[in-house]
């Protein structure tokens, strides 16, 4: 199961996760959870060719976002000696253990193993640290919760308890 795979991932990578947690201030369990959601703890890095995937999107009309990502893919390919025709990605061109789009790979990637290359495919240290760095650089606050309270919209505010129970939600909207 996913939970067992997560426990195994944390156990096998405990020292790395502990070190990254100290260095970046991001909980090892959140890091592991993201990697679990993105790649099933590294067991599935994708089956697509990122060059084909991003190239196709880059030349759709008025799609400057993917044109920039194509350039970023070429930059990371050259910098880290990755062949964009043979590495694997998700259907959306996301790369490596944390499934980063090329610009995020270039911007948030961390060479945590110190070999001079950010390698989110073959280095667990780099992949784990890059996920933590992404969270830290995007406002992660050490010791904070990853969720926040929200106000329920009018659509849900008028529902009776019986109506809410019929929705089969795993949380209570009326708290």
Task: List where the protein language model places each region.
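Short, solvent-exposed loop/turn and secondary-structure capping segments
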Residues: 44-48, 87-88
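A contiguous strand-loop segment
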Residues: 11, 62, 66-88, 172-174
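Short glycine/serine/threonine-biased micro-segments
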Residues: 40, 44, 91-94
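Flexible, glycine-rich surface segments
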Residues: 80, 84-175
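Hydrophobic alpha-helical segments
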Residues: 41, 52, 116-117
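Export/targeting segments at the very N-terminus of extracytoplasmic proteins
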Residues: 2-36, 46-72
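Sec-exported extracytoplasmic/periplasmic mature domains
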Residues: 22-26, 36-43, 55-59, 75-82, ...
